[in-house]
């Protein structure tokens, strides 16, 4: 009733407890298990925040903003903008779950001196409202944590790639 939230938040034990306490404070008689039973049923639709973001975007106006973004990177490779465009479309396709059979096996690799805004460019790929699905800190030496990050984040900037050992590269 009064405690309804309009913004997506990841659900954890703390959030479940808050839902139960808020409902009880509003006079709704229930048990903790009632909340879990409802939340983990088909009555609550699966929510994908990136899909929701993409769905709310206006229709495409025909302007190629991806190649325009790629062109902001100083690069002598004549294929850079086309390759970045292909990678970007594949990334979004994977966000939407269109291609679960194949992984995106291509990743842009930005090479340059310290302080040339490589990480800033990577961060700018994600819109501000979706930046919680971006990270630039991943530790490949801890396999379990790395696998969790690969599932949790939509875009991972592997900063200092030259320091990742060949066994950790895959």
Q: What are the residue ranges of the model-derived segments?
A:
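Conserved AAA+/SF3 P-loop NTPase catalytic/coupling segment centered on the Walker-B
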Residues: 154-170
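Generic structural signal for alpha-helix starts
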Residues: 31, 127-128, 165
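Intein modules and their embedded homing endonuclease domains
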Residues: 1-60
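P-loop NTPase catalytic core of nucleic-acid-dependent motor ATPases
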Residues: 38-152
């Amino acid at each position: 009733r009064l405690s309804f939230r309009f913004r997506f938040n990841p659900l954890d034990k703390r959030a479940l407890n808050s839902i139960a306490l808020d409902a009880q404070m509003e006079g709704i008689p229930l048990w903790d298990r009632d909340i879990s039973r409802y939340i983990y049923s088909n009555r609550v639709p699966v929510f994908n925040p990136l899909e929701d973001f993409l769905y709310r975007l206006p229709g495409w106006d025909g302007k190629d903003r991806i190649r325009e973004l790629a062109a902001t990177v100083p690069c002598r490779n004549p294929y850079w903008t086309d390759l970045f465009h292909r990678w970007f479309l594949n990334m979004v396709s994977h966000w939407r779950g269109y291609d679960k059979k194949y992984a995106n096996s291509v990743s842009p690799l930005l090479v340059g001196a310290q302080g040339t805004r490589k990480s800033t460019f990577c961060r700018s790929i994600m819109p501000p409202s979706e930046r919680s699905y971006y990270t630039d800190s991943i530790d490949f030496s801890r396999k379990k944590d790395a696998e969790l990050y690969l599932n949790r984040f939509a875009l991972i900037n592997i900063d200092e790639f030259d320091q990742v050992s060949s066994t950790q590269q895959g």
